[in-house]
Amino acid sequence: VQGIRTLTYGGVSVQVVIHMPSASVKDALVLYHPTVWFDDRTLPAAENTLDNFKRLLQRDDMLLVSVAYPQQNREIGEGLREAEAALLWVKNEASRALGLSIGRVFIAGHSQGAYIVTRLNTLHQTDGVIANAPGPLDFEYRCLLEERGNAPGSQECGLMVARHGPASANPAPYRRISLLSFTAGFKADALFVQGVGDSAIQMRSWPLFKQSVQACTDCQRPVFLEVAGGHDALFMSFEAREAFNQFIDQRRSR
């Protein structure tokens, strides 16, 4: 059974796409889509993200909740309010609202969705986090490239320039929301997947991110998997799919 639902938690409303398997549900996987910017694209992105992760899973006994968190006219990370509300609804209200008994709760995301789950892992306890090609890792660098004409312009950097001025003149707000600023305090084990053929911007900062997380002294266990392929490596690589399922299965059986 699959359907769209608007949920509210703590006064924050967000649309989600829910997949309820025919098998008896034991655990939940909350999903976060990549960058789409425009509000009218977030729901299709959430549906697409749900389908992609549903294909990855080797068994159909998890409640899947894909979150259509907003991005339009918001700085990177500002959609965290809605992303967080959906996670807390699944943790605290979904069992009663859906008539299920949910045990463990996992979160997963791709690209900016992986950024979101990594930040959520600093805020809330879950049973495991999967992040594929998380980013932006270094938003200052990304927007500096655009400022210098070395990368095509984006709405995300344009919004920051309008609010804070260019990165060259005021780098602090850009650094503050970069994922490189969120590499400590992880509350759950995390699997980070990265295709080594991803963009030059991503691969420039990936080793710095990996090194910083591995140096963390107050994190649960982070696992890094680098595989052949590009930005969508988790969905294309057999090795990544096996690691994804193993990561979840090991933590479901504890």
Summary of predicted features, one role per range:
Residues 21-29, 186:
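Proline/glycine-enriched tight loop/beta-turn segments at coil->beta junctions
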Residues 1-23:
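N-terminal cap/lid segment of alpha/beta-hydrolase-fold proteins
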Residues 76, 200, 207-210, 214-254:
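C-terminal catalytic histidine-bearing segment of alpha/beta-hydrolase fold enzymes
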